[in-house]
């Protein structure tokens, strides 16, 4: 089975279970999506392994809550997820990712810089 990146527009029961494992701090009812508030996820064997929330506003995009399930980390899933999010939103010329809730800022800085982001006060930017 191939790892695929998807935009979640409707949540299946299994999606809800997997999202609770990825983001235990969010209630399912708080994960609302529309054209400007999106959730992208990495799926493998019908299970979500990682997810990120995306907020779009004109040519600007904000990423938050990027999380890869612990057992899947360090395998390129997060990188593939973000690369596909950026590729699927070509109208966005400037991206921002806040560092709120980041477990290890040093690790995340290296990760974000590998994707072309630069460290800023409070997060990372790619314009």
Swiss-Prot record:
Knockout consequence? Answer: Deletion mutants are deficient in the biosynthetic pathway for pantothenate.
Q: Which InterPro entries match?
A: Acyl_CoA_acyltransferase, GNAT_dom, PanZ, PanZ_GNAT
- Domain annotation N-acetyltransferase: ranges: 1-127
GO biological process assignments? pantothenate biosynthetic process; protein processing; zymogen activation
Query: Impact of changing residue 45 to A on the protein?
Result: Loss of affinity for PanD. Is still able to activate but not regulate the PanD protein
Q: What SUPFAM superfamilies does this protein map onto?
A: Acyl-CoA N-acyltransferases (Nat)
Highest taxon above the source species: Bacteria
UniProt record similarity statement: Belongs to the PanZ/PanM family.
User: Subunit structure of this entry?
Assistant: Interacts with PanD in the presence of CoA. Forms a heterooctameric complex composed of four PanD subunits and four PanZ subunits. Monomer in solution.
* Name of the protein this chain belongs to: PanD regulatory factor
What high-level taxonomic lineage is stated for the organism? Bacteria, Pseudomonadati, Pseudomonadota, Gammaproteobacteria, Enterobacterales
């Amino acid at each position: 089975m191939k790892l695929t990146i998807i935009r979640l527009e409707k949540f299946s029961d299994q999606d809800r279970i997997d999202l609770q494992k990825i983001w235990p701090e969010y209630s399912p009812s708080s994960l609302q999506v529309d054209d400007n508030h999106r959730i992208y996820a990495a799926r493998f064997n019908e299970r979500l392994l990682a997810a990120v929330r995306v907020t779009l506003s004109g040519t600007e995009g904000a990423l938050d809550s990027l999380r890869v399930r612990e057992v899947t980390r360090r395998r390129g899933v997060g990188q593939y997820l973000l690369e596909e999010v950026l590729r699927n939103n070509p109208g966005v010329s400037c991206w921002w990712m806040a560092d709120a809730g980041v477990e290890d800022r040093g690790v995340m800085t290296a990760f974000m810089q590998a994707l072309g982001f630069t460290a800023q006060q409070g997060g990372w930017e790619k314009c």
